[in-house]
Amino acid sequence: MLLSGCIGGSSPHVFNGEEPNIGGDAYRFTLIDQDNESWSLSDAEGKVVVLTFIFTRCPDVCLAVTASMLWVQNNLDEQDLDQVQFVSVTVDPWTDTFEVLREYSTSRGAEWPHLTVADAGAGGDSQQNYAALESIWGKFDVGMEMYGVENDTDYLIEHSLPTYILDRTLEKRVVWLGSEWNPELFKQDVEYLIQE
């Protein structure tokens, strides 16, 4: 007797978070960190990567995600912590210079890489830098909109807030959306990928 149907197929989603809309290998990008040093996602290969998108002037949700990531970092076993790389990428490169990101990360005890571009202002290289960052946002399904622009410092940003967990090969395996996620369940997803 022959049965029709599928045997095997993709494995079930075993995570507390969601399956990414844009899955597969993560886009390998290079930006500058809060120490004005080049930082490449490729350098994190071999570790589980927690990757989010924030901005320092954000009054609420970005602070909540940073605090949750810090909780996860502080509550991982020491041997597990060595196998995880936390990373934050700005959605406000006009304000979030490396100096601003340094102050933000230091004041919150969030010493992982906080990334931006060298210059996102008007003109030559700065437009290319902004375009590169915009491409990164697109590859990670980050929507961003500026409004209320009165001058260079008086504007608001609204953005989606995905936090990805990438496996050791830098494949996007799980995403947590928004800021109201449970850090304990998030930590379980990180630990699952550490043990995988």
Spans of model-derived segments:
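Sec/Tat-exported extracytoplasmic proteins
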Residues: 48, 55, 73-80, 108, ...
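Secretory targeting signatures
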Residues: 1-12
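Thiol-/selenol-based redox modules, centered on thioredoxin-like
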Residues: 138-139, 143-196
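Structural microenvironment flanking redox-active thiols in thiol-disulfide oxidoreductases
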Residues: 66-134
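N-terminal "domain-start" segment that seeds a small globular fold
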Residues: 11-42
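Short loop/turn microsegments at loop-to-beta-strand junctions
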Residues: 26-27, 48-49, 160-162
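Short active-site neighborhood of thiol/selenol oxidoreductases, capturing the structured segment around
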Residues: 39-69
